[in-house]
Amino acid sequence: MPTIKQLIRNTRQPIRNVTKSPALRGCPQRRGTCTRVYTITPKKPNSALRKVARVRLTSGFEITAYIPGIGHNSQEHSVVLVRGGRVKDLPGVRYHIVRGTLDAVGVKDRQQGRSSAL
């Protein structure tokens, strides 16, 4: 506990909140170009081949974004829209590609859940 004299000498610093998606620069979504599309394996105890893409955003950042849904048409040089939202079992993947916008087509034969999330 600081004394009053110590508080006068240097005031309390406010706690700065750190953003979970710095590459978006405060925007809800960002456009980017795929530089590489590949699969990675999740951490324990899960097992799969998760589809991800390396994306160069208009903000200048190069990020790894998850491609949700079953089947995709994304390839190198595809222009995609990226939103925030991490994938819990993929370390370092903090963004999602928005399906159904720009070059990323929606999920084929999907009956439900045609929201922005997929």
Swiss-Prot record:
Keywords annotated in UniProt: Chloroplast, Plastid, Ribonucleoprotein, Ribosomal protein, RNA-binding, rRNA-binding
One Gene Ontology molecular-function label: rRNA binding
Pfam families: Ribosom_S12_S23 (PF00164)
Classification via CDD domains: Ribosomal_S12
Keyword field contains Thylakoid: no
CC terms in the record's Gene Ontology section: chloroplast; small ribosomal subunit
Subcellular location: Plastid, Chloroplast
GO biological process: translation
Record function comment: With S4 and S5 plays an important role in translational accuracy. Located at the interface of the 30S and 50S subunits.
Family, per entry: Belongs to the universal ribosomal protein uS12 family.
HAMAP family linked: Ribosomal_uS12_B
Quaternary structure, from the entry: Part of the 30S ribosomal subunit.
Protein name (database record): Small ribosomal subunit protein uS12cz/uS12cy
Primary gene name: rps12-A
